[in-house]
C-alpha cells in the first residue's frame, strides 16, 4: 500500500509548494499562509493604524486548552499548566480574503511547472532538478535594492 506524504511546515512561497510536490509530496499544509484571512479564525484588531488578525497555532497552550492537546499526546495531562507548547499565539497582518492568496499560489505553481515543462502535477515528479544554493544566493535571487511599494 502507498503511504501518503504530506509536506507540513516551511511553506512560505508558491515555489515551496512546487518543490514539495516535485520531491514526492502528495499534499502540502499551508496554514500559516492562510492565517490573517477572512476565512481563518480569530478577531481583527487595529494596531498602529494597521489591521491584524489574532493567530493561534494548534500546538499553542491556548489551543491545547481548547481541545487540541490530544494531537500532541498531552491530553492525559490533567494539569494544563504542564502542557508543553509546540506552537505560538500572536497577531498576523490582516490579509483579506483567502481567494487572493490561493490565486497567487496557483499562479506561482503553474509558473514553476512551466519552467520544468510539466503539464500536470504528476509530471513534476518525473525529472525534478534540485539545485542547492547558499543563503546569500537565495536572498540574491529575490527582489533587492528596491523598496517594493506594490506586489
Model-identified regions with their sequence ranges:
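Alpha/beta catalytic cores of nucleotide-metabolism and tRNA/nucleoside-modifying enzymes
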Residues: 1-7, 12-151
Amino acid at each position: 500500500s502507498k503511504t501518503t506524504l504530506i509536506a507540513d511546515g516551511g511553506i512560505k512561497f508558491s515555489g515551496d509548494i512546487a518543490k514539495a510536490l516535485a520531491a514526492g509530496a502528495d499534499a502540502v499544509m499551508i496554514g500559516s499562509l492562510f492565517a490573517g484571512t477572512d476565512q481563518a479564525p480569530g478577531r481583527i484588531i487595529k494596531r498602529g493604524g494597521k489591521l491584524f488578525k489574532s493567530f493561534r497555532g494548534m500546538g499553542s497552550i491556548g489551543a491545547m486548552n481548547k481541545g487540541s492537546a490530544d494531537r500532541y499526546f498531552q491530553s492525559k495531562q490533567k494539569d494544563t499548566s504542564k502542557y508543553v507548547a509546540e506552537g505560538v499565539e500572536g497577531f498576523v497582518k490582516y490579509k483579506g480574503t483567502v481567494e487572493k492568496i490561493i490565486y497567487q499560489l496557483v499562479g506561482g505553481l503553474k509558473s514553476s511547472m512551466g519552467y520544468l515543462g510539466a503539464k500536470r502535477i504528476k509530471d513534476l515528479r518525473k525529472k525534478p532538478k534540485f539545485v542547492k544554493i547558499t543563503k546569500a544566493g537565495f536572498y540574491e535571487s529575490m527582489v533587492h535594492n528596491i523598496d517594493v511599494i506594490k506586489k
